């Protein structure tokens, strides 16, 4: 009962800024984890966070109540949850072409066996992001909204982070021509793999 009381107390004190940062960090979580465990150049680890953090910040700033935007990103959030589950099977890997093809071509028995092996990661990842949708709902239904001053300030911070990331990428591209955003930065890498998977299916 104490936990429930504390939760109610937190909900009563939380404002849109609190919701905003919780949802931003929830969107960024796969990038942070991949930057730690994924085998990629150091510049790729940095860009994985520096490029996507301001993008997520700006997306959630596009509405006075960030929870509404978060619900609009439902498919992306599902992809995040799937990516975190995948890391428990293939440490340091993003959703790849062969993995996507296996989803459509695997036998029901094989799929059932795989699901039984990753049941706990699915529950953990699904539970975490279910809680973020609760936060998003609280944000969307709240009478309060992000103040214009906060939105302007965070938008400026986001642009500044992008301006820092841009020369890092340009410098890395000159030194390492093989560095591509579609390969180094999640979820761009997954979307590119989805494109490759569709071309192989048809």
Feature-to-residue mapping (PLM):
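Transmembrane and membrane-interface helices of multi-pass
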Residues: 2-188
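Membrane/wall-proximal cationic-aromatic binding patches
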Residues: 182-202
């Amino acid at each position: 009962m104490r936990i429930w009381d504390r939760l109610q107390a937190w909900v009563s004190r939380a404002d849109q800024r609190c919701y905003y940062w919780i949802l931003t960090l929830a969107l960024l979580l796969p990038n942070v984890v991949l930057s730690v465990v994924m085998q990629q150049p150091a510049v790729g680890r940095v860009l994985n966070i520096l490029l996507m953090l301001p993008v997520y910040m700006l997306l959630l700033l596009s509405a006075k109540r960030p929870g509404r935007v978060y619900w609009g990103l439902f498919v992306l959030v599902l992809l995040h949850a799937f990516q975190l589950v995948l890391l428990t099977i293939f440490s340091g890997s993003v959703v790849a072409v062969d993995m996507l093809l296996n989803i459509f071509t695997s036998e029901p028995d094989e799929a059932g066996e795989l699901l039984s092996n990753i049941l706990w990661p699915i529950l953990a990842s699904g539970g975490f992001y279910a809680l973020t949708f609760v936060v998003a709902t609280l944000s969307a239904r709240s009478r309060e909204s992000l103040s214009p001053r906060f939105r302007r300030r965070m938008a400026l911070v986001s642009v500044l982070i992008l301006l820092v990331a841009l020369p890092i990428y340009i410098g890395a591209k000159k030194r390492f021509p093989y560095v591509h955003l579609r390969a180094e930065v999640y979820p761009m890498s997954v979307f590119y793999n989805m494109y490759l998977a569709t071309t192989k299916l048809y």
